[in-house]
Amino acid sequence: LMKRLEVVLKRNPEERYMVGELTLYPDRKQVFTGKTEISLTAKEYQLLEYLMRNQGQVLTKENILETIWGVDGQFVVDNTVSVTINRLRRKIEPDGERQGYIQNVFGLGYRIGEKER
């Protein structure tokens, strides 16, 4: 029985997204920096998951608003995305680095990737 379980577990590894030390487990709705679990609000988690699922791609504020908040921006304040990104950065970046995992792409939007040194 144990051998069967091991075979099944190896066949179906748990889904996860990784960027540097940052790991997100969508099934468990958990985020870790190294071995430390990070506590996020629902919107922060949704935003981080969206960024990590689209790793390396530039996502516009409008696209993020529509996907995460489900609106085209008409009922949400302009800087909602920026404020949520800043809160998220403070939680996931070492010392709240401004351009760590989440990077601004001037005039276009945001993307997540390895930290720029």
Language-model segments: residues:
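A structural micro-motif at secondary-structure boundaries
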Residues: 19, 23-45, 111-117
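Positively charged, aromatic-enriched patches within helix-turn-helix-type DNA-binding elements
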Residues: 30-42, 46-100, 105-106
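Basic, amphipathic DNA-recognition helix from helix-turn-helix-like DNA-binding domains
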Residues: 1-18
